[in-house]
Amino acid sequence: MPLPSLSVVTPSFNSAEFLDDAIQSVRHQRAVAVEHIVMDGGSTDGTTVLLQRYPHLQWKSEPDQGQSDAINKGFRCAKGDLVGWLNADDYYLPGGLHAIARAAAEHPEADVIYGDCLFVDSEGRLVRSKVEHAFDAAILMYFGCYIPSTSTFFRRRLIESGVLLDCDYRVCMDFEYFARLAHAGCEFHYVPRFIAAFRWHENNISLSQAARRFQERRQVQLRFGARRHSDATFRWLADLHRAKRMARKVITGNIARELRVRRMLGQDTRWLETNAGWETCASLACW
C-alpha cells in the first residue's frame, strides 16, 4: 500500500537552543517521504546559522504576526499529502511519522490523524506520558484540548480549502482549530502510539501564559456552544466528560500504557544515535 507523503512545518523564534533536536528528529524518520519547512520569525540567536547547515530544509526568516501566522505560512508552502506542525522545542520519536502515514493510508476517510506524545524537560528527560483515546467531540469541548498538536497531521485538502489557524489565538490555536474542524464534520482518527515529545520548560508559550490560555479556551467553548449552560451546569458536564475520558482510557488499556512509561521517568528520550537515549526513545515510541 503506497503511503502518503508528509510535510512538517516548524515555527521558530529565537529557539536555536532546541531547534536542532527538532530537525534531527524529522531528518531521521524512516520509510516515509517527508519535507521539513521552518518558518522563522526573524531570530537573532543564531537560528539562521543553524538552518544553513541543513540544505534539505526549506526555510525562511522574516518577521511574522506570531506562531499561528508562521504555521499558516508554512502550511501554504507544503506539498505533502499530510501536513502537521512541530514546534521548534519539540521532536518526533522513531517511526512516528511512518505510523501516521500508515494510519492515513488505511483510513482514507480521516481528515485528521493524531497519536500520543511524551512530556519531557528541557534536557529531553521523560516527565510524563500523554496517552489519549478515539476522538470524541463532546470530550474535546467540555474537558478541553486533549489532542496533542505535536502528534497531529491534517490532510492537505483542508489547507487547500482555506482552513487555516486563526491568528487571533496565541495560545489555544490548536484547540480552536480542532473545535472548528469537528464542528465542520471532519473525521478524526486516533493512532495508539507515541508519535512525538512535547518539551516542558519555562519559556514554553503553552505553559507560561495561563491567564490567556484560560481566556482563549473559554472563548472557544462559547463560540461552539459548550458554554451555553450556567457555570454550575458547565462544571457538572466538564466533570462528567472527564470521567468519560478516564473510562475510555481504562477500557482500551491506555492507562496501563501510561503506568508502564512511568518506569522510565527521568531517562533521556532525545533522538541521539550516539548514546542510550536512542534506545530509550525507540522503545518508548512502540509502547
Predicted stretch roles:
Residues Q24-A33:
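Short, acidic, metal-binding catalytic loop of nucleotide-sugar glycosyltransferases
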Residues Y91, G95-V127:
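Conserved donor NDP-sugar-binding/catalytic core segment of glycosyltransferases
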Residues E62-A78:
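Glycine-rich, basic loop-to-helix element that forms the pyrophosphate-binding segment
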Residues P4-S7, E35, E176:
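Cell-envelope/extracellular polymer assembly enzymes that use nucleotide-activated donors
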